[in-house]
Amino acid sequence: MQRRIMGIETEFGVTCTFHGHRRLSPDEVARYLFRRVVSWGRSSNVFLQNGARLYLDVGSHPEYATAECDSLIQLINHDRAGELVLEDLLVDAEQRLSDEGIGGDIYLFKNNTDSAGNSYGCHENYLVVRAGEFSRISDVLLPFLVTRQLICGAGKVLQTPKAATFCLSQRAEHIWEGVSSATTRSRPIINTRDEPHADAEKYRRLHVIVGDSNMSEMTTLLKVGSAALVLEMIEAGVVFRDFALDNPIRAIREASHDPTGRRPVRLAGGRQASALDIQREYHARAVEHMTNRRPDPEMDMVVDLWGRMLDAVERDDFSKVDTEVDWVIKRKLFQRYQDKYSMELSDPKIAQLDLAFHDIKRGRGVFDVLSRKGLVTRATTDEAIATAVNEPPQTTRAKLRGDFISAAQKAGRDFTVDWVHLKLNDQAQRTVLCKDPFRSVDERVDRLIASM
């Protein structure tokens, strides 16, 4: 499948610093964030005019799920649009707090761990063809996903009793299974809960919950693009070397603790391979595969950055990727800071910097400051992201949902939507079932909108 439906769900960390004596719990702060949403949507779980879903997840984490996208840049635009939507809620909530005499600064972090060691996720969704055994996909995909953090981890400082160490991934410490149907209880790498939000006879939805939330657009491009390409190769029957892991959970932690990519991980049957070896194999197959598929400038960018990143790891020279890959950008920032102020990695100021890197408020968040200084390579533009805040992707089912929501809100009509249903809550209770996520035009939806 060369045109694939993809989406990203991001949970955001919330904290608030108060100016006066009055204090609020994270739950209460999250409710302030969603007060405006509840006022028009009558719920803290809503779909927006751009086709996305916005809701308050368990544990007071706001979650933004992008609409269905069928290209990488489109997906990046809609993922970044989520940051703007949340930032808008943040500004509104701070004003409400101020109006009620509770002075405070709200912080929203696009990261995966808080100071108490809790983890929240960034989930990727890929539509895959149902043909063949699911185990074929998971067998090839698992070693790739376990080692993918080498090319697209967000990076973090891990405080251990002995010392602080720089790790590749924020999420790796919190993954407890390889393949499972649960997401919160056991945190697997691939989630098999089969809710395709499409024709279940044709498709399944692959739910990957192992990835880090990325700040860099280029890192998101690489994270999602490389996974989509591996899925495409699996569907095309490309043969890969067997890298079945002896213990995926131990391997994911070992890989995270090794920015050199050279430490061997145990494979099934007692063999060994490093994260770099494993990624090299998948990249080599991707380079080969690109010569046999239709041209795609986005995928060319993915394969190029993937190769440059592996070269950088191998040579221990990151100068050609240090504006593109999150963990490299972050580590360089820490090193500059340590050199300038003669401090250890374990210094609390580094931990603060680690957190501030993921602050989504423009002008305050460290990543945004780096971006404004031209120290970060972009994959898209501010204009395209701003457009995605209000407009759904024009090439997928999201357009039907977004257009329906816009029309119903304009007409003041009561409605209910989910990923596949559009319903007018009138006497007739007219409902349209949209099973095909690739379809952006539907006469039934046009008739429903016209009837308003």
Curated annotation (Swiss-Prot):
A Pfam family that the UniProt record links to this protein: Pup_ligase
GO molecular function, a single term: ligase activity, forming carbon-nitrogen bonds
Superkingdom in the source lineage: Bacteria
Keywords carried by this UniProt record: ATP-binding, Ligase, Magnesium, Metal-binding, Nucleotide-binding, Ubl conjugation pathway
Coiled coil location: none
Reaction equations catalysed: ATP + [prokaryotic ubiquitin-like protein]-L-glutamate + [protein]-L-lysine = ADP + phosphate + N(6)-([prokaryotic ubiquitin-like protein]-gamma-L-glutamyl)-[protein]-L-lysine
EC numbers on record: 6.3.1.19
Name of the top EC class for this enzyme: ligase
Pathway: Protein degradation; proteasomal Pup-dependent pathway; Protein modification; protein pupylation
Active site per the UniProt annotation: D57 (proton acceptor)
Biological process (GO), any one: modification-dependent protein catabolic process
Keyword Nucleotide-binding carried by entry: yes
Binding site for ATP: R53, T66, W419
Role noted for this protein: Catalyzes the covalent attachment of the prokaryotic ubiquitin-like protein modifier Pup to the proteasomal substrate proteins, thereby targeting them for proteasomal degradation. This tagging system is termed pupylation. The ligation reaction involves the side-chain carboxylate of the C-terminal glutamate of Pup and the side-chain amino group of a substrate lysine.
Family to which this protein belongs: Belongs to the Pup ligase/Pup deamidase family. Pup-conjugating enzyme subfamily.
Other remarks on this protein: The reaction mechanism probably proceeds via the activation of Pup by phosphorylation of its C-terminal glutamate, which is then subject to nucleophilic attack by the substrate lysine, resulting in an isopeptide bond and the release of phosphate as a good leaving group.
Protein known as: Pup--protein ligase
Organism: Gordonia bronchialis (strain ATCC 25592 / DSM 43247 / BCRC 13721 / JCM 3198 / KCTC 3076 / NBRC 16047 / NCTC 10667)
Native organism taxonomy: Bacteria, Bacillati, Actinomycetota, Actinomycetes, Mycobacteriales
